[in-house]
């Protein structure tokens, strides 16, 4: 029986993880559920899954949750950073699902890595903000890192076993690999006229054609910043050289990514667009378990199409790829600026196309600095957020 801590339990990844646990009760137990402020959803999850611990990032939310839970469940409710870090590093914990969206997930995820846990990584920002430090800590502690993002999980499945065992420090060329092909649907605005993008609303941006996701990642998919962040994440997970990683638009989201080998072979991982598949794979690796996902019906798929990304339509993707090549400072700044800009767009304070403008200006204005510690990373993150908010106030 594996004990899991689920960071981001009330989000889409968290709920899908709990569904997989429920389908495999003889193998997994939700040891602790972690959320930010969603008291009602957390209460319902606690009643259904009976974790030993429920942690709310917000202290007042923790108090409301404690009052809302029926007596007799025996669930300990906590809040605060110290309690959270204690949960992810607890001796009873085998696996940590890192699914808190954004920079907020970095500290507990890094703590789980340092404690040598099996970490299922759905929080791409951890690598975008601190890729070099994160991978060094993974190697030092011996933690097992398994990607949950559908694309990175697909790539992982298409790699030789030896490369899988050396994630973060692998040599793709030595394994006969020429390219990793990172696929993306292009989001809801793939074919929208360019002159209409400035007036797109949050509701329109959140209507992804294939995936069911939260608001932040839905907007990132509409700008293709999500693919840009995944590009950066893939660089760290698979130790890619500059010319070993490419982005391919694939509107149907049936092929989740591909690996191209030197002999001309291309291995692709395919399946219906349901996050329970990569979650179940990461949870059970190297075995396989039921995920509750319908098998792919090739007769219904009909056809698959591919095209190159249009950077005039998706400037955020180009910003992210360029930042990846510039280094850790640029990706840390970009991630922070984008989180602030997307929040402002969802609040109706800026337009859709302003997101890329804010991101680009932040990248151009913050002075370069050497990020040699977590404190330095967090300081740069704070400075980028301050600048982004300043720029937004002038829009």
Curated annotation (Swiss-Prot):
Belongs to the DXR family. Its cofactor is Mg(2+); Mn(2+). The lineage of its organism: Bacteria, Pseudomonadati, Pseudomonadota, Gammaproteobacteria, Alteromonadales. NCBIfam families: Dxr (TIGR00243), PRK05447.1-1 (NF003938), PRK12464.1 (NF009114). One of its GO terms (molecular function) is 1-deoxy-D-xylulose-5-phosphate reductoisomerase activity. It catalyses: 2-C-methyl-D-erythritol 4-phosphate + NADP(+) = 1-deoxy-D-xylulose 5-phosphate + NADPH + H(+). GO terms for biological process: isopentenyl diphosphate biosynthetic process, methylerythritol 4-phosphate pathway involved in terpenoid biosynthetic process. Mn(2+) binds at residues 149, 151, 230. The gene is dxr. Its EC number is 1.1.1.267. It comes from the Bacteria. It is an enzyme of class 1 (oxidoreductase). Keywords: Isoprene biosynthesis, Manganese, Metal-binding, NADP, Oxidoreductase. Pathway: Isoprenoid biosynthesis; isopentenyl diphosphate biosynthesis via DXP pathway; isopentenyl diphosphate from 1-deoxy-D-xylulose 5-phosphate: step 1/6. It comes from Shewanella amazonensis (strain ATCC BAA-1098 / SB2B). Catalyzes the NADPH-dependent rearrangement and reduction of 1-deoxy-D-xylulose-5-phosphate (DXP) to 2-C-methyl-D-erythritol 4-phosphate (MEP). 1-deoxy-D-xylulose 5-phosphate binds at residues 124, 150-151, 185, 208, 221, 226-227, 230. This is 1-deoxy-D-xylulose 5-phosphate reductoisomerase. Pfam families: DXP_redisom_C, DXP_reductoisom, DXPR_C. InterPro entries: DXP_reductoisomerase, DXP_reductoisomerase_C, DXP_reductoisomerase_N, DXPR_C, DXPR_C_sf, NAD(P)-bd_dom_sf. NADPH binds at residues 10-13, 36, 123, 125, 214.
